[in-house]
Amino acid sequence: MEARVEQFIENNRLFGMETNVLVAVSGGPDSMALLAIMANLREKWKLNLFGVHVNHRLRGEESNKDAELVQSFSARLGVPCNVKDVDVAAFKAEHHVGTQQAARALRYQVFQGEMERVHATVLLTAHHGDDEVETAFMKLTRGTTPLTKLGIAATRPFANGVLARPLLEETKRSIVAYCHEKAIPYRIDQSNFSDAYTRNRFRMNMAPYLVEENPHIHKHIGRFDRWQEEDNHYLMEQAKAHLDQILTKKSEKSIELEIQALCLAPFPLQRRMIHLILNYLHLNVYGVNDMRVFPDAIEQIQAFLQTSAPSAQLDLPGRVQVKRSYGTCLFTTAPFIETKAYCHLLSIPGKVDTPLGVIRADTREELLELEHTDAVSFQVSQVAFPLYIRNRKPGDKLSPSGMSGSKKVNRLFIDRKVDRAKRDAWPLLVDANDSILWVPSLQTSRILTRSANVQGELLHVTFSQHKWP
């Protein structure tokens, strides 16, 4: 088995000579066998070898015994091994995810930190051929896409190097036999036999029959994946280049683009661009680039972008929201403003903080000639005091300057293409009679129409908007 694993390392160029290698060791037979094999190859390959164990503290004393066994076996092999405890419950509460997702995210955070600490460029995990079969059929069952691998990759970029899986062509049976042959100790996690987890159900109920039909099924899945991966790599590079061309804004938590530019692209590129966007946002939320994109999610987004409504919002799992506003589409994880009704007295001089920005008021001796709509200047005698800053109410209307009749504030927002997420938070300047004097940045009322002969004290009100993702 050692010779096969070494050949796999060479064929797939998992790492070279004189490399700093970190092995993730859980205490189970797979990772303990991997650690032993790497310890045997250490001198020949001139490796600096390290181990890391993550104690998720999910099984009480059993978890502690796993950690103790890993430490003692690593010491026996002369491999420095660091054990790190993590708080899965706290991560679950903060990020609103399940136990398995929280444990995985924390585990890989530890792996990244440990790679940096020991200056490792390669992280080895003990995924094997049976895992590949389980993974492939789990993905097919839940609805995978050709955008991602069907099985498990031999390598992938991770932290400041790569994550590699040297045991992918080995079966579970061969690994356990190796442990018995070499007297390698290991522990069995009893939760691996629980029907509560999807992977366990596939492992116990489906995989044995598939392996019985063809003991080399994991190799066939691997070959299928390699061919598909080459095809997908080419299409994904095309999608990345096209996405870079149509992006209008990009931040850590949001991506904005023109809807028409996305919809004009061929469907294979559309799907891959959406996939790239979701992965980018998911990485910034959880710190792990493992977003599982279901086909119906991608198609749902495509259909959403084709709707005739000028503005709409789509909520997706993973705290991702897709918002279309007229010709643009915003993919974001940034929280949208949730505004309750507010009404604040506007002191003169003074200021009012609103969810969208700051309103300031002061008196002036001269009427300003304004060249923008973020400020308004008028005679104090024109309005009924006190003045207030509030957000909109149902049925709000104003009498627009330069127009006859009245206009609903909601219609004003629509006509001026104000983002739906901002409308309920938008500040309005009203007088003592609750008449709308000014919709900042959008419209003034006829009440503030300037007279030919300006006399008396003048009031100047400005609106400074916050930055919006």
From Swiss-Prot:
Keyword GTP-binding belongs to the record: no
Name of this chain's protein: tRNA(Ile)-lysidine synthase
Function: Ligates lysine onto the cytidine present at position 34 of the AUA codon-specific tRNA(Ile) that contains the anticodon CAU, in an ATP-dependent manner. Cytidine is converted to lysidine, thus changing the amino acid specificity of the tRNA from methionine to isoleucine.
GO biological process, one term: tRNA modification
Uppermost EC category: ligase
Pfam families: ATP_bind_3, TilS_C
Keyword tags: ATP-binding, Cytoplasm, Ligase, Nucleotide-binding, tRNA processing
EC number assigned by the record: 6.3.4.19
Chain sites annotated for binding ATP: S26, G27, G28, P29, D30, S31
Cellular component annotations (GO), alphabetically ordered: cytoplasm
Entry's localization field: Cytoplasm
GO terms for MF: ATP binding; tRNA(Ile)-lysidine synthase activity
Entry note about domains: The N-terminal region contains the highly conserved SGGXDS motif, predicted to be a P-loop motif involved in ATP binding.
